[in-house]
Amino acid sequence: MSFYFDKNTDIKSNEKTVHVNINNLMYAFITDNNVFSKKGLDFGTRTMLECLDLKSINGDVLDFGCGYGPVGIYIKSNTNSNVDMIDINERAINLAKKNAKLNNVDVNIFESDIYSNVSKKYDYIITNPPIRVGKEILYKILVGALDYLKENGSLIFVINKDQGAKSTMEYLKNYYNVNILEKNKGFYVFQCQKHWLIA
């Protein structure tokens, strides 16, 4: 499962198109080997997207670890937000660009190792983070988002209870005001707003 946090593109390409229904809206996505959830939208990402209050999402949005692009494309197609999408995986970036065109959305997609190429601040950072990288890097991603959120910005992410949802929530309370947006079959969707004590 090197695709979770890997620039490797040596695995042979085998592009396929999957059709996905999200909140009764149909999307087509080109997927490939060495990208996350290549057979279709995974349950965690679906849980996160379907619980979002799209009317409240506006301004600048970052889709962190975009993969082939379902999160950013869904948000852009349903809001007036300016959406940036990043991933470390070159194949995922190329697929996301193809899928943005396929779904007729105007988004900005670029490669970044965590936040290395991110130069602005966002109203929302939204992610199904790469859990299998381990807690050290996971926390670096989640806490690191603080530096890239605007004053009242929010980090929204999904994580399974078996992957440490509750311990992650408790850890993030040191940095954010944390709310549970959704719980579904072991998946937790958290919204984390900057703690008022943190500039």
Predicted feature locations:
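Conserved SAM-binding loop and adjacent beta-strand
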Residues: 32-49
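Conserved SAM/SAH cofactor-binding pocket of Class I
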Residues: 44-127
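A short glycine-rich, Lys/Arg-flanked "PGG" loop and its adjoining helix->strand segment in the class I
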Residues: 139-151
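Core SAM-dependent methyltransferase catalytic element
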Residues: 183-199
